[in-house]
UniProtKB/Swiss-Prot annotation:
BP GO annotations: phosphate-containing compound metabolic process
Lineage: Eukaryota, Fungi, Dikarya, Ascomycota, Saccharomycotina
Pfam short name (any one): Pyrophosphatase
PANTHER family tied to this protein: INORGANIC PYROPHOSPHATASE (PTHR10286)
Family listed: Belongs to the PPase family.
Signal peptide: none
Keyword Mitochondrion: no
Requisite cofactors: Mg(2+)
Binding site for Mg(2+) 2: 121
Coiled-coil segments: none
Known catalytic reactions: diphosphate + H2O = 2 phosphate + H(+)
Protein name as annotated: Inorganic pyrophosphatase
Residues holding diphosphate: 79
Source species of the chain: Candida glabrata (strain ATCC 2001 / BCRC 20586 / JCM 3761 / NBRC 0622 / NRRL Y-65 / CBS 138) (Yeast)
Lineage: superkingdom: Eukaryota
Amino acid sequence: MVYTTRQIGAKNTLDYKVFIEEDGKPVSPFHDIPLYADKEENIFNMVVEIPRWTNAKLEITKEETLNPIIQDTKKGKLRYVRNCFPHHGYIHNYGAFPQTWEDPNQTHPETKAVGDNDPVDVLEIGETIGYTGQVKQVKVLGIMALLDEGETDWKVIAIDINDPLAPKLNDIEDVEKYFPGLLRATNEWFRIYKIPDGKPENQFAFSGEAKNKKYALDIIKETNESWKQLIAGKSTDSKDIALENTKVTDSPYYSASAASAIPAAAPQADAPIDKSVDKWFFISGSA
């Protein structure tokens, strides 16, 4: 399946939206794109939200029909992640698995925290920088459990199946073998990245340990089951998530007409980013 993007507005503005298209028709990256690209081989579709080494906090929105990717805001202002020395922006291609949901109505028995109400986050560690709205096929290697302001926020570690090293990476121990230092740097980055904004250091479950592939696959399956309950209208509380979709025909939220209501593409040149986003922050105790 080949997916394309439909951009509306200029990057780095409040109007910026990226819809994902299949055969020229908008689909939901939350609900319509299949989780599995190849279920037998455990190959997954990942939606790239934030390319590596960029700062804009882009995410699949839960509030709008067909869930376009937009830039997050706080108090009406666009959000950017800070540069925490020695890192620049997001240190991996950052995105999400479609058809997953970290259920905020459920407490995970091992993390002792509820889900964060988002699709499962994916950190793609391959050599190629992705682009917003790209649908990558990835293999899962492991998972970390960030505890973000009291919520479970899973971070799946994966690699693009087309990466030159993908054939050599099959489980979490292979990451340390072929990418020495990457897991440590990932742990550090997630611990400290909110500190420049005045927030406390994040914590991890499992003392920051990255769990193996089997554990990750179990979590993905659990969150896929939670999404199935959500899209079927059987969740305890759907948290006002926009559930319109164009592919899940047995869902009460299926809509054959939702795509036609999406505006035509209207891309504009990127707006400038405030120079303050370039600043480096030095965090005591990091690295």
